[in-house]
């Protein structure tokens, strides 16, 4: 539950005591952040899309980390000196960035899927990737998909969410071809699926020599 605006003075004093005792500000004040995310993403409303670019208060923990605290009053929140409507109860909130693991869970990507790149690149790939369980549900209706081995050509493969979905369905993949140009996506795919055959830029299919050349390279 958010902190009641009427009790701010009392609560702020209590927060100082907690910060001194524990070295951090407990996350109980953030309704979206009480526990680590373990499930897929719920439907989000536009009113819930708030960034953490400006804070009405800043708490500094024992290790020097600064934690922004936002105040919601009358259904409005102030960001960079401007007020915006928001559907939260009045009070103070700690709004934090999701971890990479939490983003994976929202996209129903297994926790075991590894990113051998920076968190920044991981966030980009997850944002550009599929919600795996949705794709798996759609492909589950493909006739005969799990009855015999299959060869896969994945265009604009990204981080190979299609491969993850096929794995969830128990599909026997004999060979997985991928077209992709982003070096971080390719690096991540090859880290998790080293048997993937990378075919480069998808636009090479316009080249008359592309098919025999690529076929010869992967045989």
Question: Model-predicted segments: where are they?
Answer:
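Class I SAM-dependent DNA methyltransferase catalytic core
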Residues: 1-153, 168-169, 181-184, 215-216
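Core alpha/beta nucleotide-donor-binding catalytic domains of modification enzymes
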Residues: 148-219
């Amino acid at each position: 539950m958010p902190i009641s605006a009427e009790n701010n003075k009392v609560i702020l004093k209590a927060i100082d005591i907690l910060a001194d005792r524990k070295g951090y500000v407990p996350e109980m004040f953030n309704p979206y952040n009480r526990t680590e995310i373990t499930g897929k993403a719920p439907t989000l409303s536009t009113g819930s899309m708030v960034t953490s670019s400006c804070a009405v208060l800043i708490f500094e923990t024992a290790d020097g980390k600064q934690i922004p605290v936002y105040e919601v009053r009358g259904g409005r929140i102030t960001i960079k000196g401007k007020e915006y409507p928001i559907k939260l109860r009045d009070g103070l909130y700690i709004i934090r960035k999701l971890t990479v693991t939490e983003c994976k869970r929202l996209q129903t990507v297994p926790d075991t899927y590894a990113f051998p790149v920076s968190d920044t690149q991981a966030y980009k790939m997850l944002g550009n990737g599929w919600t795996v369980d949705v794709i798996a549900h759609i492909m589950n209706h493909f006739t005969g998909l799990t009855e015999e081995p299959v060869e896969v050509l994945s265009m604009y493969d990204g981080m190979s969410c299609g491969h993850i979905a096929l794995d969830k369905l128990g599909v026997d993949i004999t060979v997985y071809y991928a077209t992709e140009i982003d070096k971080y996506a390719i690096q991540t795919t090859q880290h998790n699926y080293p048997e993937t055959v990378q075919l480069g830029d998808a636009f090479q299919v316009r080249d008359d020599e592309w098919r025999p050349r690529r076929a010869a390279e992967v045989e």
